[in-house]
Amino acid sequence: MKMTFRWYGDTDPVPLAYIRQIPGMVGVVSAIYDVPVGEVWPIDRIRSLKEKIEAHGLTLEVIESVPVHEDIKLGKPTRDTLIVNYGQTLRNLGACGVKVVCYNFMPVFDWTRTSLEMPLPDGSTTLAFDTQAIRELDVSEGIQLPGWDASYRPEQLKALLRDYEALDEAGLWANLDYFLRAIIPVAKEAGIKMAIHPDDPPRPIFGLPRIVKNRADLQRVLDIVDDPANGLTLCSGSLGADLQNDIPALVREFGARGRIHFAHLRNVQTNAAGDFHETSHRSADGSLDMAEIVKAYFETGFEGYARPDHGRMIWGETGRAGYGLFDRALGAVYLNGIWEGLAKHPADHAAE
């Protein structure tokens, strides 16, 4: 398991020098954030980013993400040109040594939360999702949430939502099918493994279809193009927001088949209504057994990339919600510690 850390470029409050100091940290996960969605990432920009990261003793082998344009998700006539551009970006990334590209197929909105600073009893703050609050939001009035790859003006958002009114889950599946059949051969040629990120949260929101929510959906994605280049970002926190998803079982099934290319490891406290908040990575603090999840990766021989995903804001830190240094660093060390214990004493855990 190669431990990595998300970095948002020069505007990120967390400097590369600090990331390098996290024990066991080998790489950075990043992207080029100022190229408009749908345009080709220039190879010189990719090289520059890679050189900057490597100068701090870290690798750039995972990109998160190359956003998929809404016209591709909607199946508009412009999608063919956009897919060609996407493929050229993959070729440029592959030429620079990138191995994995994380992406998602969520309509309009990326990961969604209703609070960025929910207070916890210990004084830290965290990201939270309240189902009722989402139901009461009027997205047509224009809202901006973290994690989006684009910020829409109210009129743009209204137009997009109108476009999606005519698209159900079957239509979105058809458009994902079209995209993957076109792009996976290009990715394979470029030496890149595509890794789809599950929907976060794993259910429809704002009346929009969501199709990567559970085991059946993950299997269906892989069946579209049955090739190792078509794989998964298995996000424990996203899928774990649905109590019906057995995360260790998913890791064992898809990991044993070599189809998990990127592991997002975080814990969430979830209730039956679908409300959740993010916790520390420690198993006891959330609904997920993180030790068992890491054990599943270990037992399936996982050699891919992992990151501690989101973290709380602790010790007075300010910055990008969910992406501070301190709690994610603690998470990385905790996860690597579980792995080291399994590696040094495998017989102690074999019968558990």
Curated annotation (Swiss-Prot):
GO biological processes: D-glucuronate catabolic process
Keyword Membrane: no
Needed co-factor(s): Fe(2+); Mn(2+)
UniProt key word Magnesium: no
NCBIfam families: PRK03906.1 (NF003027), uxuA (TIGR00695)
Function recorded in the entry: Catalyzes the dehydration of D-mannonate.
Entry similarity comment: Belongs to the mannonate dehydratase family.
Protein name: Mannonate dehydratase
